[in-house]
Regions:
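Charge-dense, helix-prone N-terminal extensions
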Residues: 1-113
């Protein structure tokens, strides 16, 4: 499965406008992951945005347009979700999700290497 290159460009452009971020792109999760300061922040998977966010905000995030739980092998991953294209069409919604992920990235633990 490929990924939406226009969405990847949109994320790349947005992140480039934020100072003091170390950004690395990696092919992961059958898409393109944006690592911020050494930690997974967001991913483009197919046409969807995959978000990593503070699990305590799940109820708020789940109310947003385009929200889909991230389920792998029958398990719901708390603090991760997919957002369909309709949920990030407007810039205000796109920025909400990217900023949500960036905020969590500040306190998220890096995975073991």
């Amino acid at each position: 499965m490929g990924y939406d290159t226009k969405l990847a460009d949109r994320i790349r452009e947005y992140l480039a406008g934020i100072p003091n971020l170390e950004i690395e792109e990696k092919k992961m999760f059958r898409g393109l992951t944006f690592m911020v300061n050494g930690k997974m922040c967001v991913n483009v998977s197919g046409e969807n945005l995959m978000c990593r966010f503070d699990p305590s905000l799940l109820d708020e995030v789940a109310e947003r347009n385009g929200y889909q739980s991230m389920i792998m092998n029958g398990k719901v991953y708390k603090g991760y979700c997919y957002i369909s294209p309709e949920g990030i069409k407007a810039n205000i919604d796109f920025e909400y999700f990217i900023n949500l992920c960036l905020e969590f990235n500040k306190t998220a633990k890096a995975s073991k290497k």
